[in-house]
Amino acid sequence: MSASPTAGQAGLSYRDAGVDIDAGDALVDRIKPFAKRTMREGVMAGIGGFGALFELSKKYQEPVLVSGTDGVGTKLKLAFQLNRHDTVGQDLVAMSVNDILVQGAEPLFFLDYFACGKLDVDTAATVIQGIARGCELAGCALIGGETAEMPSMYPDGEYDLAGFAVGAVEKKKIIDGSTITPGDVVLGLASSGAHSNGYSLVRKIIEVAKPDLDADFHGQRLQDAIMAPTRIYVKPLLSLIETLPVKGMAHITGGGLTENVPRVLAQDVTAVLHRDAWTLPPLFQWLQAQGRVADDEMHRVFNCGIGMVVIVAKEDAERAIRHLQAAGEAVWQIGEIRERAEGEAQTIVI
């Protein structure tokens, strides 16, 4: 029996199966200029090859590679609902580069994974343009990625994202929290909003409260406040690390303040945070009021206006604050480190 189509019959194609190779090629052409703007020293071969090549700088004597991977979570559901895809790319980059930053690593390169049921070139290009913008803010190269069109795997109009960042730090300069002692000061850097965490609760609050997402909210639309892209702290904090001893950092992501700060603390110390040291931003006030969310729940779900925590010696605190403010960051002294009492939580908000 012949496997070839008989006369008058058209053979099946990949397009018939739901995969548009031409659309994929068109997307690659669209995103190449975005990726090109992120190129930096060390990139040997980027988008287009089977593997991307990156050469470590000779400035490192004992380089340690630091890697991180993350997604954007259910914030994507709001992106689909609102048909706005311009911010989630920066979110994707921020989640990984901010994570590797806390160990003192300079982000070197980034790869993305974009998966969908049916590829919409305009939507995907908008997302990847945001990824490239995030890479520029972090100083890392968008060196490669994967776009997977998988019919029936995702509903029309929906997609998922994953990102992967690799950075490097000098071995003797790794920041791991091991030098944190009682009396050290906890600094908090302002977030730009809810960043990319707690959005299952955000969506539930929206479902229950049914707000007008186009309504004015402190000078912008409510949806703009909710969808604000995650702040990327790489450049100001790398500069700070070169200026004075940073003992520890915590990226405030899933788990909020009370579950992320302990990740950089030894078992014998506690971070005491003072809620009156900074003003709870309007978005979080609105979320708490509309959802009747308890204070403790707010602190373990949301960043509550603090996107990154930095721990320094007391004598370095004022200089660190001035340095970060000069770099454009809003920063507050939000607490201190003390000896941990038996059975006490490692981060408490009072």
Swiss-Prot record:
Keywords: ATP-binding, Cytoplasm, Ligase, Nucleotide-binding, Purine biosynthesis. It catalyses: 2-formamido-N(1)-(5-O-phospho-beta-D-ribosyl)acetamidine + ATP = 5-amino-1-(5-phospho-beta-D-ribosyl)imidazole + ADP + phosphate + H(+). It is found in: Cytoplasm. GO terms for cellular component: cytosol. Pathway: Purine metabolism; IMP biosynthesis via de novo pathway; 5-amino-1-(5-phospho-D-ribosyl)imidazole from N(2)-formyl-N(1)-(5-phospho-D-ribosyl)glycinamide: step 2/2. Its EC number is 6.3.3.1. GO terms for biological process: 'de novo' IMP biosynthetic process; adenine biosynthetic process. Gene3D superfamilies: PurM-like C-terminal domain, PurM-like, N-terminal domain. Coiled coil: none annotated. It is an enzyme of class 6 (ligase). PANTHER family: TRIFUNCTIONAL PURINE BIOSYNTHETIC PROTEIN ADENOSINE-3, TRIFUNCTIONAL PURINE BIOSYNTHETIC PROTEIN ADENOSINE-3-RELATED. Belongs to the AIR synthase family. This is Phosphoribosylformylglycinamidine cyclo-ligase. It comes from Cupriavidus taiwanensis (strain DSM 17343 / BCRC 17206 / CCUG 44338 / CIP 107171 / LMG 19424 / R1).
